[in-house]
Amino acid sequence: MRKYLILLVLIANLGLGIQSFSAMTRQERENLEKQISEAYDRDDQKKLLPLVTKYVNEFPNNADYLNKLGVLYDNLDNYSEAEKYYLKAMERGNYNAISNLAYVYYEKEDYEKAIKYYNEYQKIADNTDNYFWIGASYEELEDYKNAKEWFLKVTKFEKDGSSENRLGLIAENEGNQKEAIKWYLASIQKGNLWAYDNLAVLYIGLGDYDNAEKLAKKGMNLAKNSDDEDLKKEFRETLDIIQAKR
């Protein structure tokens, strides 16, 4: 699942930036904002970082732009800088930064902090895009009860089968192979390619090499046009294991 980062322009936050001291004239500020807007329209990441940094240096109390800068650093996997600017944005009242910070902690594998900030954000707004990552954080902590609760919520609206695949993995970790097969098949029904490999591996463990091979080959064929090289590697390794077992 693609990571979800919120970039919401809040007029109130812009006001905060305008009020802070700056040597910029009004015209210079408007020109800078126009350049930033155009860079976002072109998705020009190289220009965005220096432009938004310049804006934040001029207007350090603008919560919206602090959050934007955090997102830009997050996209560069510079989590320490992302964390710094998200915290500053939060201090100045940007609620979206709370959710973004939670995801940074997930990326840093600090799952307890991720859950803490996701829960803090959920008190403000019920953002369903966060459900999967809350479940994933609990799963990483092996708190399967809470993980299942959140993943089950996601199954009601998401379309890529990621949560069903995770429920399959949890069931398998709990030793419930029947339940795992059920969830992997549900994930496959939604087109999730990782579920093909996970179910194939489960069948290998059961000694059902025919079904394992069918799933791995079908999954590999479907993954031909995918950019996910890790997935393709998994299918190749699974097929190698099947051949070695026979």
Task: Give the residues covered by each predicted segment.
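Short helix-capping/linker turns of helical repeat alpha-solenoids
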Residues: 61, 93-94, 125-126, 158-159, ...
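Canonical tetratricopeptide repeat
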Residues: 67-68, 100, 133, 166, ...
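N-terminal leader/linker segments that initiate helical-solenoid repeat arrays
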Residues: 17-64
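Terminal, low-structured helical/coil segments at or just beyond the last alpha-helical repeat
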Residues: 205, 211-246
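Register position in tetratricopeptide repeats
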Residues: 41, 75, 107-108, 140, ...
